[in-house]
């Protein structure tokens, strides 16, 4: 048995289920879940129609590398979205379709880490739990960079010692952040690329929330964009992860891609030739339709903007909470312990949120998730408004 499995922490939702044991919420109140980041807006009908249309491809094995048409569409989307030089991305070398970013983010560490060198995998804290699990099962030690209000919820990369960077083989960043919604600016991304060059590590940039943002004039910047502006048109040591789950409300499609450094992509393709399933062909054709359309993405953003505005109008007077730059999460500070808050809110108002400490670890003398909760505004607008009113009543009775 793999001994590294013993190092894995219980998953946040396992902890959450245990926390709620013994509570009996009021039966007259319908349950509203703000805990899970699963999009609830309608999937684009034209994408679903294309997938059904292509069901005859079930008789064919898909290629790990994916359809050329899909890789070309992804190149076009990246080039337009992040203002990359025309033809700087080669669909044969720089793009690899994957079954959603969760699987790819985990597998990437298994392919990149040399466990014989006492490696570190550096990651934000709090974080998407896959980063830590991937590091541990690859035989690496996670190194946590706290993100707090004092740092604008961005890791203080300047506080990392040279000795730590020397041991770093892989840096996970998440921009926009989960759960904070904070966006790493382009100058910081450029400095990270310089550090990767100096200390010889790879940057894995999780950008799956990049298309959900508040200001239509300020879309979040990306790692490839920073590399391009530096003249790094080969995207050396830079790899980005994108998905249709949040962008297009297609979490069940399990469709995403990895893009960047051609040498790294080639090694990852070799790994995936042995491990992982290729994306079904009908999913790939549906993905081509999704990546090729922006109107449904704009419409999706508008729905989230409406929910943020409505919910914050209700909660801001009674809760320490700010509108994030991007993502669909609120990350408020709680007036009581985050576990106590979560359990009592469920028991009294039949609303589920996620304690912040379940998404973070103790590091450098603190736990940055303590006394915060994650609220995912994924439910319909009316449900989000109802949830906000119940949370306000709950807070007024504390």
Across the structure, where does each feature detected by a protein language model lie?
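Conserved N-terminal alpha-helix of the aminotransferase class I/II PLP-enzyme fold
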Residues: 54, 61-99
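PLP-dependent class I/II
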Residues: 2-12, 22-52, 84-398
């Amino acid at each position: 048995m793999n001994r590294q499995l013993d190092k894995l922490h219980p998953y946040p939702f396992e902890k959450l289920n245990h926390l709620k044991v013994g509570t009996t919420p009021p039966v007259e109140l319908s349950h509203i879940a703000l805990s899970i980041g699963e999009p609830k807006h309608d999937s684009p009908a034209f994408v679903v129609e294309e997938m059904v249309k292509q069901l005859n491809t079930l008789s064919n094995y898909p290629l790990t590398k994916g359809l050329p048409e899909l890789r070309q569409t992804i190149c076009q989307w990246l080039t337009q979205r992040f203002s990359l030089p025309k033809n700087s991305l080669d669909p044969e070398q720089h793009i690899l379709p994957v079954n959603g970013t969760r699987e790819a983010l985990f597998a990437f560490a298994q392919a990149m880490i040399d466990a014989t060198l006492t490696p570190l995998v550096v990651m934000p804290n709090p974080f998407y739990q896959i980063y830590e699990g991937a590091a541990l099962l690859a035989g690496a030690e996670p190194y946590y960079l706290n993100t707090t209000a004092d740092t604008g919820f961005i890791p203080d990369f300047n506080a990392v010692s040279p000795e730590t960077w020397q041991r770093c083989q892989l840096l996970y960043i998440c921009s926009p952040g989960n759960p904070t919604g904070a966006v790493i600016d382009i100058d910081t991304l450029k400095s990270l690329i310089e550090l990767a060059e100096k200390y010889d590590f790879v940057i894995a940039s999780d950008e799956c929330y990049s298309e959900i943002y508040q200001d239509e004039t300020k879309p979040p910047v990306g790692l490839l964009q920073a590399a391009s502006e530096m003249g790094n048109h080969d995207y050396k040591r830079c790899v980005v992860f994108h998905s249709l789950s949040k962008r297009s409300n297609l979490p069940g499609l399990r469709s995403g891609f990895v893009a960047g450094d051609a040498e790294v992509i080639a090694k990852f393709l070799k790994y995936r030739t042995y491990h992982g399933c290729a994306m079904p062909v009908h999913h790939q054709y549906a993905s081509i339709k999704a990546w090729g359309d922006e109107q449904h993405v704009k419409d999706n953003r508008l729905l989230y903007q409406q929910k943020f505005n409505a919910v914050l109008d209700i909660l801001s007077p009674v809760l320490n909470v700010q509108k994030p730059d991007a993502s669909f999460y609120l990350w408020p500070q709680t007036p009581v312990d985050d576990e106590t808050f979560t359990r009592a809110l469920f028991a009294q108002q039949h609303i589920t949120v996620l304690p912040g400490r379940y998404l973070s670890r103790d590091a450098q003398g603190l736990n940055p998730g303590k006394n915060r909760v994650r609220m995912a505004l994924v439910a319909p607008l009316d449900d989000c408004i109802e949830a906000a009113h119940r949370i306000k009543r709950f807070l007024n009775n504390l």
